[in-house]
Design a protein with these regions (language model features):
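Conserved short acidic donor-positioning loop in nucleotide-sugar-dependent glycosyltransferases
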Residues: 2-6
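Short catalytic/ligand-binding loop motif for oxyanion handling, primarily in non-cytosolic enzymes
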Residues: 7-11, 28-29, 76-80, 85, ...
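Active-site-proximal specificity loops/subdomain of glycosyltransferases
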Residues: 8-63
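Residues that flank catalytic or metal-binding motifs in active/ligand-binding sites
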Residues: 15, 71-73, 99-102
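Short loop segments at secondary-structure junctions
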Residues: 23-25, 107-111
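GT-A fold catalytic core of metal-dependent nucleotide-sugar glycosyltransferases
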Residues: 50-93
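A short, conserved acidic/glycine-rich loop-to-beta-strand motif
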Residues: 89-105
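Catalytic core and acceptor-binding pocket of nucleotide-sugar-dependent glycosyltransferases
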Residues: 113-210
Length: 210
């Protein structure tokens, strides 16, 4: 869904992407229709807290799909499907991949799609009722939110760090905590995302998820 002019997105020419137009007001009404209490959704930024509930909110749209997910709009993606296959995501029937709010993938099942509701009685910031009725951003999609609930749920997850978390305060491509790394990135239709690193005088090529 987008509130932008769909015609201008046709330049992407992506056969596996379907764009649907929906105003923010109509989206708010759609989200509200899924809950029996008055939600707080005054600005698009608050949607960060609702991302983990998309499997529940958009359950009609997701019928027929085995998995769903979300990611930030400034993420440069590698070959997601190849990555999941290489790490036996489907073979092991993992319920979720993800560590941070950059990108997460969920199995499309009723049990998994309701995990975000399981924080009642734990603490204030993990109770979805508190999260969805407050104007405050709870970073519910991050490590101190949905991650805690999935750890408690007992579902099997793919949890290793397969991404490069780039420090946006520097011009050069460095991860948080790195000092003067020597790294370049390239992307191609054939090979996806590739990082070229100079480590101890040797060139090391990696294929991060993002």
């Amino acid at each position: 869904y987008t509130d932008q002019n769909v015609d201008q997105l046709e330049i992407l020419n992506a056969e596996n992407i379907e764009f649907k137009t929906l105003s923010f007001d109509d989206l708010r009404k759609k989200v509200q229709s899924k809950f029996d209490f008055e939600i707080s959704l005054k600005t698009p930024y608050k949607l960060c807290d609702y991302k983990v509930a998309y499997g529940f909110i958009f359950e009609e749209e997701l019928k027929g799909y085995d998995y769903w997910g979300f990611c930030d709009t400034d993420v440069l993606l590698g070959d997601i499907y190849q990555f999941l296959e290489e790490h036996s995501f489907f073979e092991n029937d993992y319920a979720r991949y993800g560590l941070l709010g950059h990108l997460q993938i969920f199995k499309n099942s009723q049990e998994v799609n309701h995990v975000f509701m399981s924080g009642q009685g734990l603490n204030y910031r993990l109770d979805y009722h508190n999260v969805f009725t407050s104007e405050q951003n709870f970073i519910f999609d991050e490590a101190e939110g949905i991650q805690k609930l999935f750890e408690k749920s007992g579902f099997e997850q793919l949890q290793d760090k397969f991404f490069d978390d780039i420090d946006i305060s520097h011009f050069s491509f460095r991860e948080y905590g790195e000092d003067e790394p020597k790294r370049y990135y390239s992307w191609s239709q054939k090979h996806g995302l590739k990082s070229i690193n100079l480590i101890d005088g040797k060139i090391v090529i990696k294929h991060p998820l993002y």
